[in-house]
């Protein structure tokens, strides 16, 4: 589970069900340790996840085969759309899991949802960064899924806007719905101005905290403007 024993195999020959089961079980153990308030076990399991070859394979597959942006490159112009390049990327990512230094993201502008006349910025990391982010997410997300409020639906696995709509409907139809407020707000460039110190403080002793700090400071590269640090 913790070494690239599949490195000489063809990408198509990898036993994906086994690797996905390894990641799923480890996520469940992290979730349970967090629920039980066992921080020491939580951190040890997260370290195991971050060393896991299964986690690397599953993360690379998600980025290079399943994600809609798999053919979109970052500032290095690299993508991995063939089996050999995916296998090479997986071995590279796993070998650099403790030494990788994030690169700036490529900033482009895309139409805003619901108002295509307006554009919003989108940061595109290099493909290796996306794979490392997937690895870190599997270690971190399982912990925070146990911490989040049950009625928080944004950017969470298994949650959607339909879940939020249903919750609002049930609340408004409930016996205590005498005065109901709905706030619709658009926070301009909110993610560009997140307080890094508060975010890092919330991570506590998370094993990949230094890599997350590096991602926050990686900055952006925009056509015609060059490099700009993250605010």
Predicted regions and their residues:
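Short, charge-rich, low-complexity alpha-helical interaction segments
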Residues: 1-4
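Charged boundary/loop elements
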Residues: 8-69, 138-155
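Generic recognition of stable, solvent-exposed alpha-helical segments in well-folded globular domains
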Residues: 18-21, 25, 40, 44, ...
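Conformational gate/switch positions in structured elements
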Residues: 38-39, 75, 187
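Reverse-transcriptase-like RNA-dependent polymerase core
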Residues: 62, 91-117, 127, 131-139, ...
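Short, conserved non-catalytic motifs in the polymerase core
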Residues: 67-83, 102-131, 147-160, 182-184, ...
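Compact soluble domain cores
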Residues: 82-90
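Conserved polymerase palm-domain catalytic core
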Residues: 147-151, 155-159, 163-231
